[in-house]
Amino acid sequence: MEIKVIIGDITQVEADAIVVNLFEEEEQLGGATADVDKALDGTIARLISQGEIRGKLGEVSIIHTLGKLPARMVAVAGLGKREDFGLDKVRRVAGEFCRSLRKLNCHKIATVLHGAGIDDIDLESSAEAIAEGSLLGLYSFDKYKKPEYKDIEQMIIVGKEEGKLSVEERGYRKGEIIAEATGLVRDMVNEPGNSMTPTRMAEIASELAERYNLKLEVFDSKEMEEMGMGAFLGVAKGSNQAPKLISLSYKRDKDSENAIGLIGKGVTFDSGGISIKPSEGMGEMKT
């Protein structure tokens, strides 16, 4: 899904759907939600008073505009209780409304910056969380099956503050990068073991190292034995695939006071414990 940021009035955006929001137990509309409600002759306010729109976290209420707006539909996303709101909620809300609108055959959507200005949530953080949540919310591993729904092709994040476009663009790009990286890991996890072998993992690591100028080291069985990695090698004996220990590292041009290390299990074959686990937990063994 392509994401872009514009500065403008969401009521004037041409799209299959535009997304505004509402906190739980708050009947007073403000901001873009009030603007959209006015264009719809008070429809949102009426549905709130009738109890059809409640603003509960994860709730997505759909209103057809019937030509009153350039957009075909309005989605009112529930933000939950204001006192519990934060960036994790923004991510969840973005995923929820994207999944709902995909099911309604929406290919182009536009959304406001949810949560911007509330507590310590700034424009950049909001844009980042929306991008991350929407892309991860739409994730589906469809390599071996036909997708159930067509993807949303474009999402427009609509800001209102002139001069803040670059800030919001920086935010959504951060979220996009995080989501792309997470999607790659999910793809690797979801591949069957006979496809995602240690050798294939090393190939992917090599591709990443070349693309992003990372240092790559791949250790074989002999080198791991010399390092005393008996437990790892013991598990690897259950497979006909040779094990690999992969190290990817990145060093900035200038010295940094902090070093960050991420260690992943990275075992593509491990049947230990499946037979002694309750049946409802077996599905989780894949990851």
Where are these regions (language model features)?
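Short amphipathic alpha-helical segment within the helicase RecA-like ATPase core
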Residues: M1-G266, S271, E284
